Amino acid sequence: VKPAPASKPEVKPAPQATPKAEEKQAPALEQNPQMHVNMGAFDTPHMRGTRSAIMSNINGWRTLTDNMYRSRVLQQGEPTGIWAHVGGGKYSFNGNGVDTDTTYTRIQGGYDAKTGSGWTIGGQVSYLRGNDDYIFNGSGKEKAFAVGMYGLKDLGNNQYIHIESQVGRASNDFTVRNEIGEKLSGETKTNAYTIGARYGKTVKLSNGTYIEPQAQLSYTHFGGDSFNAGSMHVDQSGVSSTVGGLGLEIGKHFGAGNLYTRLGVNHVFSGTVKTTYTSGATTKYTSEDIKGTWTDLAFGGRYGFNANNSIFADISTGLSGDYKAGWSVNAGFTHKF
């Protein structure tokens, strides 16, 4: 068995030790010098970049749907009616070879009203756009869209429950690169849905001050996708995950508004993203465990100009975790006819 000719510059050694001649790896690379999936117990930079794009898409959907934002401000005293909310921020994910940073803008709007049964119910539309950064100057453009319904009810004894469901679609148009700048471009898009519930109890103190422990549980299914990135074919499995959260809010009501600070800890109990990559005659597999814990801190408030018009705003930041919100700023208004 002759070794691969040294005169062909496009033949690059495998990232690990030089393969034995009987493995015949060099001839395979010669036949396809643009191969993006190589034999061995490792993933190539193009595979790693594609994993980053998939994880960014999942985290974009999570950012769009996980906080039950409208129910929270209604609980704090916001009037029902037509409302809109715009926000922006950053989040990152770092783990298992995936390293992503995303800057995003989120817009939500809807309408809600009180019913005779004691529930406040509403419908909403949500949209997110994000720009991703990956290893070796890779990049992605995220888009996520969802429609949903929500409701909240006073259970008595200063207790409440919030419920919400959202269904929509998320996509990521990405370009990934390896160490020498060779790039692959592709687009992954899939359907997703989320349902969740939150329980809280308000402990009223003196002078309008309160303490409010909260517990939240949500379930998300993020669909699978099959797509091409250059000459590499990718099959991503669907993933289902359950997320639980505990929070403690401390605030103060004053006149027509309130101020608060909230500390939260969240944990993903389940979820594995399984992906198959094929380039030429070579196929490899990766399995991404998305279980983990993260914490966040928020400050915010609301103010009512009159019975029909009010504003609300908050700023939050992540404190720890593989999934970490760098910062987020949100503001909105409600108008009641």
Regions found by a protein language model. Give the residues of each.
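Cleavable N-terminal export/targeting peptides
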Residues: 1-35
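Outer membrane beta-barrel translocator domains of Type V secretion systems
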Residues: 29-211, 316, 321
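Transmembrane beta-strands of outer-membrane beta-barrel proteins
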Residues: 82-84, 121-123, 147, 161-163, ...
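Short, internal active-site loops enriched in acidic
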Residues: 89, 128-130, 218-220, 264-267
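Solvent-exposed, glycine/polar-rich loop segments of beta-barrel outer-membrane systems
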Residues: 96-102, 137, 171-189, 221-242, ...
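Short, well-ordered alpha-helical segments in soluble proteins
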Residues: 171, 201-203, 217-223, 254
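Outer membrane beta-barrel transmembrane domains
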Residues: 205, 234-337
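Short, structured loop/turn "capping" segments at alpha-beta junctions
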Residues: 206-212, 222-226, 255-259
